Structures are given as C-alpha cells and as structure tokens.
C-alpha cells in the first residue's frame, strides 16, 4: 500500500501523481499508461495503425513500396471518481504529527482516515475499469466501457469442469496478434477454479499453485480483484489496453462544517481507457454446477 498522504491545510488543495497514491489500482497494474489528463471531462487521443501491412524482403538499392496502412485514432474517454468524507475535529487532531495519537499508541488517525478514502477510490476505479456497461446501441460513447464488457472482445466459452476454455482463449488471442499477460478474476471465481477436480477426484489446479502468493495458470499471472464481476475471467493483454490518468487531488475544508466542529476531505481521480484491438482480449464464463 502507498504511504499515508498528509492532509493539506485550511481550504487548500494539493495534487500528487496517482501512481504514487494508489499504485495498487487496476489501471496501473493491468493497462498501459498512454498519457495524462487534466481538466473537466477530457479525452486523450492515441494514434494507432489498422491492419498492419506485412514486411517484405527488398533487394539492395531497390525501391521500397509504400504500404496501404492507414493511421487510426483511439479516443480514450475519462470519468472522475470522487469521495467526500466529513470527520470530527477530534479525529483530525489525533495525528502523529501533532503528538495527539490515540491513547498514546502512536496511531496516525488522519493517515488511517485518508487510507480508507484511498481504498474507496481504488475500489470504485477498479469496478468501472472491469464492469462499466457498454453504451446503448445508437448512442455515442460518453464513458469508457469496462474491459469485461468491451465490444468485440473474444467470447471464450464456458468453464464447467475443465480449464480448456482458458487454453483456447489464450490461443485465439495469440492467433489475432495479441500477447496474453494475465488472468483477471475475483476471489470467488478463483476459489471455484481451485476446487475443480478431474474424473478421478484429483484437484485440477495443483495445491502448490494455490498456496503461492503470486499464483499463475498456464504461465499467466492471476490478478485477483474483488471488484471484478462474478462468474467471469478476463484474459488480458496489458499492451493492448491504453489508459489516461490524472493526479489524485486532495482538498480539505474547515469552514463548511464549522457548526458541527468538523472538517471535510475530498479526493478526486480522473482516468479512462480504450482498446484498439478488442480481439486481443477474451472473457470466459464460469458455469457453476
């Protein structure tokens, strides 16, 4: 976890690179950062090529013919994630910096409060990264679509009692030119996979895999996130998911809640993502018996 962020002073606003404050967010672990965004509802435009022309062999001194590849542009839409909490001044006074920790225990209460707010930001950011709905047909895209719901993604079939659909999805992505980098799922899905048994009653996934702090299947790291949807697995290709992120903005007010002897703290974070080649990702469904 990132180190606790000190609260700014009266009515002030401070900013910090989001990767320093919330490094565990999925956007930093499972996408490629293409640029930064600031301001009100901005978009980032990332150039890429369509169907790439094949390279050719050319004799020394011979002319090299131009390819017919046309440049395209990926529009990365962004959304702002925010949280506003109000705390009693008694809580704000109990910080290690002011020598007023709880019962002399040395606990930095302000740090604990802001860490809780950062977790709220991470959870919401991860939830929309994975699960944002696709736009309604015929309507323009105003927010990025969650990777599990991304239009054009490979539908990798259903897992019932074998892991074959994962193998097939990896093969399909590779055939399409992608490079699978990991499997994203929630803890319930991972638990279901760990309990799968073959016809002779033996666990399909070795206990050694289950017990390692960094599990992997078929050479791909398993990225566990409680905000991933239930009953689904994403075969991700980090190099094919481009994202844009802004700073974490932290603001404090001691005036608005004056009559309550309280202060307010606000955290905001803007980010978005896009996938130029959706068939470089796959989603697999779990059919639980």
PLM feature segments, named:
Residues 40, 146-258, 263, 269-271:
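Extended oligomerization regions of viral-like shell subunits
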Residues 44, 81-87, 224, 267:
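Short amphipathic
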Residues 54-57, 86, 95-96, 192-195, ...:
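Short helix/loop capping segments that flank catalytic or ligand/cofactor-binding pockets
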Residues 75, 80-172, 283-289:
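Alpha-helical scaffold segments that mediate packing/assembly in large oligomeric complexes
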Residues 2-83, 161-164:
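Assembly/oligomerization interface modules of large self-assembling protein complexes
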